[in-house]
Amino acid sequence: MLVNAAGVSPSQVPIEAILKVDLYGTAVLLEEVGRVIAPGGVGVTILNQSCWRMPALMAEQGEKPATTPTEELLSLDFLQPENIRDTLHAYQMAKRCNEKRVTAQAVEWGKRGARLNDIAPGIIVTPL
């Protein structure tokens, strides 16, 4: 079983770190675990409701987050820091791209007899 909840806060790190940890890190993890996951295995990636608080990806961006080779993912034009407004936008983009990536990887995992899903919890009020 894989539960991927790793990530960094948009209030604590720069755009590049968010994309590297939250997007690239997830892509590497899904790819590597996907190669060895046993039949009956299960994976869950935690998204965030904020990925739905931004406009849809533009048509030319399409399925690129799902289909671009992992090592080229951070080279996509729309993921360059100069094309991202701020750290919150970077966080939202990373999570939205992860949603597309998980959807594509779920097909690959399924070929091995494993399941992969993502969940996006809503807002939870905490003392922080």
What are these regions (language model features)?
Residues 28-32:
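Short, conserved SAM-binding segment of the class I
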Residues 18-19:
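A hydrophobic alpha-helix adjacent to the NAD(P)-binding/active-site core of NAD(P)-dependent oxidoreductases
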Residues 27, 126-127:
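Alpha-helical elements of the RecA-like P-loop NTPase motor core of helicases
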Residues 7-12, 35, 39-113, 121-126:
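Catalytic loop of short-chain dehydrogenase/reductase
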